[in-house]
């Protein structure tokens, strides 16, 4: 099992746009083979207000590669990406993989 970690730097004035994006991808991610742990927004209590996180599990790297291909062809997924790009709420994103150890 591997976990895709996507760290987003977001425009903190557009949190609602990012939240709508995250909610719109729940079904496309599942449909395309990802096991969504969740999308996470910053709180007002501590830490940066312009960082968000997504965590998605896959059985292996081949499953992730299949997911990427399927998501690129998914009409709902591509519409969500187009909407978030036009909103400008994501400043940048970094992807990496994590392995659960306990």
Where are these regions (language model features)?
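Short beta-strand-to-loop capping motifs
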Residues: 8-12, 56-60
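An amphipathic, aromatic/His-enriched active-site/gating alpha helix that lines ligand/cofactor pockets
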Residues: 20-37, 57-95
């Amino acid at each position: 099992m591997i976990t895709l970690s996507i760290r987003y730097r977001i425009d903190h004035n557009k949190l609602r746009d990012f939240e709508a994006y995250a909610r719109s991808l729940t079904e496309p991610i599942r449909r395309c083979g990802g096991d969504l742990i969740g999308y996470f927004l910053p709180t007002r209590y501590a830490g940066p207000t312009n960082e968000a996180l997504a965590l998605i599990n896959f059985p292996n790297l081949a499953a992730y590669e299949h997911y990427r291909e399927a998501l690129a062809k998914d009409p709902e997924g591509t519409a969500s990406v187009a909407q978030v790009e036009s909103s400008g709420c994501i400043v940048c994103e970094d992807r990496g993989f994590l392995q659960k150890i306990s």
